[in-house]
């Protein structure tokens, strides 16, 4: 069962659960006035906890469709509930199933709705910010919509990796950054160097919002890579030779 966008269940979830969550945790929201009241946009948060997407769904006033692991839909209950909440299941093994999820995301955006995707591709178990994958940039170029970097701070402390239950009475900050507009690149929509440039700009903005240390590898590829300041990588993103050099050392995204 494929999600075709966030539905009424997410609206009800927000209405019922938000008052309860506000009693359990303290939320500090910044930059939410930057989000458009209508029209398509892509929200790209860092990912350090299972709670990241849930807290965004609670506090963003519009419904959001999010990509989620297909493994979550392993029972008849989750097969109904997660798509009704707006989850678009993606098979991380790649191939046609992964492409189907991105096609669904494109339809969501073309209907003028919000779509959320974690550019790191998976949760960061050590709290570092990892290299972003180019899916969000590719979608934004196809649809012509802005990308909003999102910084989520505190969810890792609320529910650390492998913790079954979240801790209460803790703080969570959610920051919406300045939109990244892709119109200036539309005539180079198929250029992977441009997609990489947009994605690096996105990860730099997320780093500015969260203060996380950055690692220049994809999440799960290497836990031993030295942290590299994002600024060192994107300071010359306009330099074509710099982009070509970075591409040469990157795995296909």
What are these regions (language model features)?
Residues 32, 46, 69, 93, ...:
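Generic beta-structure capping elements
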Residues 22-30, 97-99, 156-159:
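Short gly/ser/thr-rich secondary-structure transition/capping motifs
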Residues 29, 66, 87-89, 147, ...:
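Conserved beta-strand scaffold positions in the cores of enzyme catalytic domains, especially
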Residues 1-9, 99-253:
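Non-catalytic C-terminal accessory region of glycerolipid acyltransferases
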Residues 15, 22-23, 35-97:
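Catalytic core of membrane glycerolipid acyltransferases/transacylases, capturing the structured
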Residues 1-23:
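Extreme N-terminal tail/first-helix region
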Residues 20-22, 81-82, 108, 139-140:
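A generic structural signal for well-ordered alpha-helical segments
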Residues 33-35, 106-107:
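Short amphipathic alpha-helix with an adjacent loop that forms part of the alpha/beta core around
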């Amino acid at each position: 069962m494929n999600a075709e966008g966030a539905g009424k269940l997410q609206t009800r979830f927000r209405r019922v659960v938000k008052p309860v969550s506000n009693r359990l945790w303290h939320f500090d929201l910044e930059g939410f006035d930057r989000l458009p009241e209508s029209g398509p946009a892509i929200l790209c948060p860092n990912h350090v906890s299972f709670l990241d997407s849930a807290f965004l769904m609670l506090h963003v006033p519009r419904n959001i469709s999010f990509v989620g692991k297909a493994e979550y839909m392993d029972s008849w209950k989750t097969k109904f509930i997660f798509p009704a909440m707006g989850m678009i299941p993606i098979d991380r093994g790649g191939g046609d199933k992964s492409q189907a999820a991105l096609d669904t995301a494109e339809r969501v955006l073309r209907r003028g709705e919000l779509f959320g995707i974690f550019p790191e591709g998976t949760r960061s178990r050590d709290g570092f910010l990892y290299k972003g994958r180019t899916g969000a940039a590719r979608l934004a170029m196809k649809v012509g919509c802005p990308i909003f970097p999102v910084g989520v701070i505190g969810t890792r402390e609320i529910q650390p990796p492998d913790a079954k239950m979240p801790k209460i009475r803790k703080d969570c900050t959610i920051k919406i950054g300045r939109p990244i507009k892709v119109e200036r690149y539309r005539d180079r929509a198929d250029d992977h160097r441009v997609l990489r440039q947009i994605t690096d700009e996105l990860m730099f903005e997320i780093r500015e919002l969260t203060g996380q240390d950055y690692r220049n590898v994809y999440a799960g590829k290497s836990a031993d890579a030295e942290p590299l300041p994002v600024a060192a990588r994107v300071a010359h993103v306009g330099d074509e030779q710099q982009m070509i050099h970075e591409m040469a050392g990157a795995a296909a995204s």
